[in-house]
Amino acid sequence: MPNLAPYGSAKAGLTGLMRTLALELAEHSIRVNSVNPTTVATPMLQNPVNFGLLRPDLDDPTAEDVLPVYRTLNALPIPYVQADDIRNAVLFLVSDEARYVTGVALPVDAGYAVK
């Protein structure tokens, strides 16, 4: 897909910022982490413009038409995660169970990063 450089650069920059802040704020017992998801079932993903980018071979592709394309992105056989999956990761990171977790880019990515 064309024109992903700004998006990818911004994501990489945020990870660097998170790690730097985690180091700088650790002495104050402030934890800084990020959640790095794969594709998430949201309007940013599920819209006619994206459908057209993913299936240029079709005149008017639908959400159903792009599911096989999305499935190829992840190691687990799913097209995308749900917003609740991201929420659960955030709730874990802010919980006492993660009280010593800092500087972590937590993937909620169905194996996208290892594929």
Regions found by a protein language model. Name each.
Residues 37-47, 51-52, 56:
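Short, flexible catalytic-loop segment of classical short-chain dehydrogenase/reductase
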Residues 74-86:
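A conserved structural motif in NAD(P)-dependent oxidoreductases
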Residues 1-5, 27-28, 96:
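Active-site loop immediately N-terminal to the catalytic Tyr-X3-Lys motif
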Residues 10, 18:
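Active-site helix of classical SDR
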Residues 50-75:
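A short C-terminal helix-loop "cap" of Rossmann-like NAD(P)-dependent dehydrogenase/epimerase domains
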Residues 91, 102-115:
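Short C-terminal tail/terminal secondary-structure segment
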Residues 26, 31, 101-103:
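Short, small/polar-rich loop/turn modules that mediate ligand/substrate recognition or access, typified
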Residues 31-41, 94, 107-109:
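Conserved SDR Rossmann-fold cofactor-binding beta-strand/turn motif
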